[in-house]
């Protein structure tokens, strides 16, 4: 069973976490013997566009919001407090070199998390993400270089859903939902360890606490 270091830094500005991912990806590509990493965190309010996303899906003046175009796949989405974001930095050569498999496996992690809270999560044919109660509850968008991953998934636990009204989320005009609508009182703090456990189970790895600084070091410290 492989190791996966779990980094849980709390509330992190988007640009900071983006740079961490880039550094972790570069380190993982250069040092294939390093363990995989899973970052679980929240962001202050921010909007991001995928590499080929249509800017018309931003329904307000871009100057009025914090907005970044990233190298991930997918359309525009919102991140903010109450949404649990996962950034796996995985070397897929140790799993399967198949991006379709990777996306479906991330979805399976989230479906199993929802099941732990008594909520039935579902896939929808032709789309990426997870739905529950007829609403999209989790979005995915990834970047892969030399079979090492970055970006990942966002699970709406109890975010400000009004923030999604400023965009066409993931290019879909259908409603966005949250776990708290289906499981009242649930919090990110409750969901986060469940996500870590489901990730370990589905990917067949052992998650253990890690230190970001050690994982970025030139000399292996993690």
From Swiss-Prot:
<protein>
    <recommendedName>
        <fullName>Octanoyltransferase</fullName>
        <ecNumber>2.3.1.181</ecNumber>
    </recommendedName>
</protein>
<dbReference type="InterPro" id="IPR000544">
    <property type="entry name" value="Octanoyltransferase"/>
</dbReference>
<feature type="domain" description="BPL/LPL catalytic">
    <location>
        <begin position="32"/>
        <end position="207"/>
    </location>
</feature>
<keyword id="KW-0012">Acyltransferase</keyword>
<dbReference type="InterPro" id="IPR020605">
    <property type="entry name" value="Octanoyltransferase_CS"/>
</dbReference>
<comment type="function">
    <text>Catalyzes the transfer of endogenously produced octanoic acid from octanoyl-acyl-carrier-protein onto the lipoyl domains of lipoate-dependent enzymes. Lipoyl-ACP can also act as a substrate although octanoyl-ACP is likely to be the physiological substrate.</text>
</comment>
<dbReference type="InterPro" id="IPR004143">
    <property type="entry name" value="BPL_LPL_catalytic"/>
</dbReference>
<keyword id="KW-0808">Transferase</keyword>
<feature type="binding site">
    <location>
        <begin position="72"/>
        <end position="79"/>
    </location>
    <ligand>
        <name>substrate</name>
    </ligand>
</feature>
<comment type="similarity">
    <text>Belongs to the LipB family.</text>
</comment>
<dbReference type="GO" id="GO:0005737">
    <property type="term" value="C:cytoplasm"/>
</dbReference>
<feature type="binding site">
    <location>
        <begin position="139"/>
        <end position="141"/>
    </location>
    <ligand>
        <name>substrate</name>
    </ligand>
</feature>
<feature type="binding site">
    <location>
        <begin position="152"/>
        <end position="154"/>
    </location>
    <ligand>
        <name>substrate</name>
    </ligand>
</feature>
<dbReference type="GO" id="GO:0036211">
    <property type="term" value="P:protein modification process"/>
</dbReference>
<keyword id="KW-0963">Cytoplasm</keyword>
<dbReference type="InterPro" id="IPR045864">
    <property type="entry name" value="aa-tRNA-synth_II/BPL/LPL"/>
</dbReference>
<dbReference type="Pfam" id="PF21948">
    <property type="entry name" value="LplA-B_cat"/>
</dbReference>
<dbReference type="GO" id="GO:0033819">
    <property type="term" value="F:lipoyl(octanoyl) transferase activity"/>
</dbReference>
<feature type="active site" description="Acyl-thioester intermediate">
    <location>
        <position position="170"/>
    </location>
</feature>
<comment type="pathway">
    <text>Protein modification; protein lipoylation via endogenous pathway; protein N(6)-(lipoyl)lysine from octanoyl-[acyl-carrier-protein]: step 1/2.</text>
</comment>
<feature type="site" description="Lowers pKa of active site Cys">
    <location>
        <position position="136"/>
    </location>
</feature>
């Amino acid at each position: 069973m492989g190791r996966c270091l779990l980094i849980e830094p709390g509330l992190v500005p988007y640009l900071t976490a983006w740079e961490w991912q880039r550094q972790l990806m570069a380190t993982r590509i250069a040092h294939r013997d390093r363990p995989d990493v899973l970052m679980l965190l929240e962001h202050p309010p921010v909007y991001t566009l995928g590499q080929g996303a249509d800017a018309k899906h931003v329904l307000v003046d871009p100057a009025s919001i914090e907005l970044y175009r990233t190298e991930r796949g997918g359309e525009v989405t919102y991140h903010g407090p109450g949404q649990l974001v996962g950034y796996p930095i995985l070397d897929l050569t140790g799993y399967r070199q198949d991006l379709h498999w990777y996306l479906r496996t991330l979805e399976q992690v989230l479906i199993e998390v929802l099941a732990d809270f008594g909520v039935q999560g579902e896939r929808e044919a032709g789309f990426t993400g997870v739905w529950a109660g007829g609403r999209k509850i989790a979005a995915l968008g990834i970047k892969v270089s030399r079979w090492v991953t970055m970006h990942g998934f966002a699970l709406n636990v109890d975010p400000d859903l009004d923030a999604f009204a400023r965009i066409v989320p993931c290019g879909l005009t259908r409603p966005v939902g949250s776990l708290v609508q289906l499981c009242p009182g649930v919090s990110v703090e409750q969901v986060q360890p469940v996500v870590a456990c489901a990730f370990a189970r589905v990917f067949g790895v052992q998650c253990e606490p890690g230190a970001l600084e050690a994982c970025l070091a030139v000399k292996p410290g993690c």
